[in-house]
Regions:
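Aromatic/His-enriched, Gly/Pro-containing loop or helix-boundary segments
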Residues: 1, 39-46, 199, 207, ...
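Short acidic, glycine/serine/threonine-rich loops at helix termini
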Residues: 20-22, 172-176, 200-204
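Phosphate-binding loop and its immediate beta->loop->alpha context
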Residues: 32-183, 192
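Short glycine-/polar-rich loops that comprise or flank the Walker A/P-loop
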Residues: 15, 52-56, 186, 216-217
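Small-residue (GG/TT-enriched) beta-loop-alpha framework at ligand/catalytic clefts
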Residues: 181, 185-203, 210-223
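Gly/Thr-rich phosphate-binding beta-strand-loop-beta motif of the actin/hexokinase/Hsp70
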Residues: 2-30, 206-223
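Conserved nucleotide-binding/hydrolysis micro-motifs of P-loop NTPases
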Residues: 14, 24-26, 64-65, 167-169, ...
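Alpha-helix termini
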Residues: 27, 68, 147-153, 205-212
């Protein structure tokens, strides 16, 4: 496996997903600072824009709903589903075809999180997917967007951290890691969000944190 050029962080959010990264080969200064990936996504039929966030919505269109070419992405893929901004917009018009809050379903111990139960209120003739599959599709889209913009540094070769809520049970934690592996994320660390927030504060303080906390202090993280 190649040596990682970048350290990547993914926020697989309930409402939005985001990917940030640091160039490990860069020195001090702007080149070595954290950056945000602008994610190419469909914003209308056949229309692609780059946004700083990927809305965590999956839309399962009727086979006759879209014209040929409407779902083509910059990297050549033409899936039979939509994620991101267009999914959110179409889903507002036809909610029975919209998968949302997959992250919340992923930590719902009362359902089979591998079963095709979403959209929950959709009739049988509408396509369904599992909370696990929905999470995987968001991660796949981020992977493809990254690889499209960084062909010499494929995501599978990079060091990657995915944040999860502290409330996730062990099963939800493992399902998140499973979705990441299925999406081609080879080197994955799953980190709880409060811990990630603390690390971010330490990094942004540029050493000043040592003057603000002492050994034995309890730090409150508010999300």
């Amino acid at each position: 496996m190649s040596e990682a050029r970048y350290a990547l962080g993914v926020d697989l959010g309930t409402t939005n997903c985001a990917l940030s990264y640091v160039d490990l080969a860069a020195g001090e200064g702007d080149a070595g600072r954290q950056q945000t990936l602008w994610v190419a996504q469909l914003t209308g039929p056949g229309a692609v824009e780059e946004r700083s966030l990927l809305p965590s919505f999956l839309y399962l269109p009727h086979p006759d709903e879209m014209a040929p070419g409407d779902l083509v992405l910059p990297w050549g893929a033409q899936p039979d589903f939509v994620v991101g901004e267009l999914a959110r917009e179409r889903g507002a018009q036809t909610p029975i075809r919209l998968v949302s809050s997959a992250k919340s379903w992923l930590c719902h111990a009362g359902v089979d999180r591998r079963a095709a139960i979403l959209p929950q209120e959709a009739p049988e003739e509408v396509a369904h997917c599992s909370p696990l599959d929905a999470s995987m599709r968001y991660l796949e889209h981020l992977r493809d967007a990254w690889n499209h913009g960084h062909p010499d540094a494929p995501l599978g070769d990079q060091e990657l951290t995915i944040t999860i809520p502290a409330s996730f049970d062990p099963a939800a934690r493992e399902l998140t890691a499973e979705a990441a592996r299925a999406a081609g994320y080879e080197r994955v660390t799953v980190l709880e969000e409060p811990q990630a927030a603390l690390y971010s504060w330490i990094q942004s303080s540029e050493g000043a944190w040592r003057e603000q906390v002492q050994v034995g202090d309890i730090i409150l993280v508010v999300d």
